[in-house]
Amino acid sequence: MNRSRKVKPLKAIIIVLFVLFVVNETSLFKNDKTHTFDEAFAKQMQGDALHTKSKGNQFVNASKQDIKAAMTVDHKDSDLMYMDLSEPIEMSEDEVNDMLKGNGILEGHGKAFLEAQKENDVNVIYLVSHAQLETGEGRSALAKGLRKGDARYYNFFGIGAFDRKAVKTGASYAQKAGWTSPDKAIKGGASFVRTQYFENGQLNLYQMRWNPQSPATNQYASDIDWPAKIAARMEVYYQKYGIKKDDIRKDFYKK
C-alpha cells in the first residue's frame, strides 16, 4: 500500500486558502501554455537543439519520427516523467544508501544526497536516479574524478558535458564550480537543477527535456529518451519504498 512521504507543513492549510491556491495554480498552468504541440515540434526541428537516441553503445541522431514520438505525452508513460520534482520526500539515510549500493563512487553518500534535497528542494530519488544514469552507476570517468593540478574534480549530473567532448567539458565545468569532492558534486548538481530548471518553471523530467514553454532552449539532455530512462529508475524505488506519486502534470500545450 502506497503512503505519502512528502514533507508536510506543521500546520493544516485553511480550506479557503487551499481553494484559492488551486484556482490560481490552474490559471497559472493555462497561462504558461505558449505553443500548440505542432508549433513546439516545429521549433525543435528548426532550432539548434541536438536530438539523439541510444543505439548499441553509442548515440546517433534521432529521426524526425523518433523525436515526435518522444515528445508526445502518452498515457502509457510513467507518471514519474510528469511529476513535480521540486518537492522533497521523506527518506532515511539507510534507504538512500541502499539505493546507492554497488554504485561505485556514489556508494555510501546517502547523507550528501539527503542534504542536497533539503538545501535545494529537489526530490532525492530523482537526484539518485539522475546521478546513476549520468555516471553509469558511479563508474564513468567524470564520476571517478579527473585530476587537474593538485585537485580532483567530480561531476555526477553531466553538467556542462557536451556530447562530443563530454569528459573534457564536464571536467572543466566541475573545476570552475569547485567540485573537489563527491559531496560537493552532489550538492552542486542539485543546486544547478534548482536554479537553472526549477526556477525556470521546468519542474518535471518532461519539461526539463522538452521545455514546452520555450521549445528548443534550456533543455537538459540531447537524448530524446532521457526522461523515460530516469523515470524508469525512479519507478523501481517508488514501488520498493511504497511512496505515493504526487503532483502529476501532463497538459503543456495549447489546443
Predicted region positions:
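Catalytic cores of secreted/periplasmic lytic hydrolases that degrade extracellular macromolecules
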Residues: 2-125, 137-255
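Outer-envelope exported proteins of Gram-negative bacteria
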Residues: 127-129
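His-Asp-centered metal-binding catalytic motifs of divalent-metal-dependent phosphohydrolases/nucleases
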Residues: 131-136
